Amino acid sequence: MISNLAYIDPVAFQLGPIEVHWYGIIIAAGILLGYFIAQEGAKRAGLHKDALVDIIFWSAIFGFITARIYFVIFQWPYYAANPAEIPMIWHGGIAIHGGLIGGFITGVIICRRNNHNPLQVGDIIAPSIILAQGIGRWGNFMNHEAHGGPVAKSVLENMHIPEFIINNMYIDGRYYQPTFLYESIWDVLGFALLLFLRKHLRIGETFFTYLIWYSIGRFFVEGLRTDSLMLTSNIRVAQLVSILLILIGIAMIIYRRFKYQPPKYKDVKALPWPK
């Protein structure tokens, strides 16, 4: 039956005059699932579930705000002419890298106030973050955005993907590459990889591995997209940021191994804010 699904309406349902979009539902579902998955790691590390809720909730809230601000900044000519659309986040238009910046800063502040080690907390929630990102890409699918360039329908059929995806890649009279799907699959693989590696890695390295893995996939997928935020006519913002995050992740793992020899993730309980 799923193969017969026709073009999907971005609006899931209405509550009176209020339209509830699939985009928001899917992103919220990804965050909620990520929270439940992170509970196991938090419990093992001795991090109280209320502390986990505070970190995830407030990081998500401020992450959404900075994700929107980031997007608006790089599309400023449009929003300067249409300022009423700036708060219309349900139309899409949030940038994951902007969300990561806001979420990271918020998480660090909460960790500092509550005497938690931010890198240990990062290790706990990194698998949840990348899984939520993978799920969230289906919100882009429902909004018919974040796709690649035009392709023939036969190209999509030869990929052996479900027909409902092919149907919804038909936008404004043309078929497009489902780049949302490429990134979603990459993120889900990253989720499995991080869970497998985490027990073997040292404190902080799961989080830095997340930055590296996600950024590698994002760099290549971004090159296929048609809606990239551009720094110049030839430089895509997300690709530049991805390169920086890869370098930061690799450098931090190497530096901390040689400088501090941090303990393995599996060998420690709750760590305080680093002295």
From Swiss-Prot:
It is found in: Cell membrane. The chain crosses the membrane at residues 18-38, 55-75, 89-109, 203-223, 235-255. A 1,2-diacyl-sn-glycero-3-phospho-(1'-sn-glycerol) binds at residue 137. InterPro entries: Lgt (IPR001640). GO terms for molecular function: phosphatidylglycerol-prolipoprotein diacylglyceryl transferase activity. It is a multi-pass membrane protein. Its EC number is 2.5.1.145. GO terms for biological process: lipoprotein biosynthetic process. It is an enzyme of class 2 (transferase). Its main location: membrane. One of its GO terms (cellular component) is plasma membrane. It comes from the Bacteria. Keywords: Cell membrane, Membrane, Transferase, Transmembrane, Transmembrane helix. Pathway: Protein modification; lipoprotein biosynthesis (diacylglyceryl transfer). Catalyzes the transfer of the diacylglyceryl group from phosphatidylglycerol to the sulfhydryl group of the N-terminal cysteine of a prolipoprotein, the first step in the formation of mature lipoproteins. Belongs to the Lgt family. This is Phosphatidylglycerol--prolipoprotein diacylglyceryl transferase. It comes from Staphylococcus carnosus (strain TM300). The gene is lgt.
